[in-house]
């Protein structure tokens, strides 16, 4: 069973939902894997904490690049069966990096003194500012997301005027004149960047 925490729509699984997934996985003899590319955001927005993942999952990984790491994710294998031969499998499939220990230094730094969690909180706080500001302008959201991904429904004419200044991904055409798009905040998003986007949205409304 493969889950993303948070999901591609910015939603999060609660501890209760992860416990239910664990029970289903056990019932059918399946393993439970959690993709944690954006895990820092989920740990801020969900009641499912890092210790819960360690208790409930067979494997999960701690995302690094979305928290400022240059490369990589930290795979955490809890199921003893899956540890056997894992290093050799990585090497055989071309995933063993020379001097890979240098990648580990990034995670040692990220997990020291709560930095990883603070970066996740920073992303979520900026996303909430963006979400609340968009709502205050009278725009709707396609998805109710508590994490760093926000999905406003904006007029195509507004998006056309914003495209040279901002970056987003189009998710779905809502009708002939509106599109649901995805804005993502990052560990380095500043207050003034959110303010500038909201000001431009207000000006173009």
Question: How would you label these PLM feature ranges?
Answer:
Residues 40-46:
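Glycine-rich, charge-decorated loop segments at or immediately adjacent to ligand/cofactor-binding or catalytic sites
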Residues 128-203:
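Conserved C-terminal alpha-helix-loop-beta "cap" of PLP-dependent enzymes
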Residues 18, 76-79, 91-92, 166-168, ...:
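Short, solvent-exposed amphipathic alpha-helical segments in soluble enzyme
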Residues 16-23, 27, 48, 52-55, ...:
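Alpha-helical scaffolding segments of alpha/beta enzyme cores, especially the outer helices
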Residues 31-33, 59, 180-182:
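Structural preference for beta-strand elements that scaffold enzyme active sites
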Residues 7, 38-40, 66, 187:
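Active-site-proximal loop/turn and secondary-structure-junction residues that shape catalytic pockets
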